[in-house]
Amino acid sequence: MSLTIPYRSSQFSVGYNDYDGVEAETGLRFRILFMKTGSEETISSRDYETAVLIIKGKGTIIYNDRECSFERSSWIDQNPVVAHFPAGDAVTVRAGQESRIAVISTLNSNQFKGKIYTPAEIDVEHRGKDILDGTCYRLVRLAFDRSIAPEPARIVLGEVLNFPGKWSSYPPHHHEQSEIYYYEFSPVEGYGHGELGDDVFKIQHQDLLVITDFRDHSQVAAPGYHMYYIWAIRHMKDNPYKGFEFTKPHDKLLI
């Protein structure tokens, strides 16, 4: 498996929409929770660490004694609300409007203190802005990694806003840990291309790319279309994700 397209440019069903086979390849389970106005959903698992990321919608997210309102009409210029919690805990989402939510999980019995990250707590990096004539300028939004989440956690999570006609995940780079990219486009008929080693895939709305085996994974959006993707990485046992390695000789582009 490399590119999975069960929901390409289609309407999600109400409830959970599972990207089958992804967990077997990466250790990460990825689902889209589609909620109608006025509905409520409690997200929990006895065995899985879980992250909940608001892609679009309006409502309230409740974790432990904290209640946090969210309203995100566009991923182009708004940061997400993200909840991250261990196995055994539960998050409740109440949808004030139709909402689309990513639910990322991994088997992990380790206990840690969960948290809700507000839009103001999302770290935004203007990566590539001043190099290569701005051709790989993008926004990288980090929800949490090893330096932010408690050490027993196994998920790293963030977003990329890939501007029209520009590259991201560039210069080419790789890492040992498995990763997934979930894509959306604005307008939704947009497309881009994703490299995976020597293979190149045409990416469309609601596709998911599985990245394994040290393969490079640079991306590019077609002119006229914003490309957005959620990226999630799973720490390996005794080998947590601490960053990527640029691929030679392309690393010289940064000198």
Which residues does each predicted region cover?
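Glycine- and acidic-residue-biased ligand/ion/polar-headgroup-sensing regions
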Residues: 46-67, 164-165, 170, 176-208, ...
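Conserved metal-binding segment of the jelly-roll/cupin
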Residues: 76-96, 106, 203-224, 230-234
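Double-stranded beta-helix
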Residues: 99-140, 195, 230-255
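Conserved hydrophobic/aromatic beta-strand scaffold that supports enzyme active sites
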Residues: 30-34, 51, 82-84, 103, ...
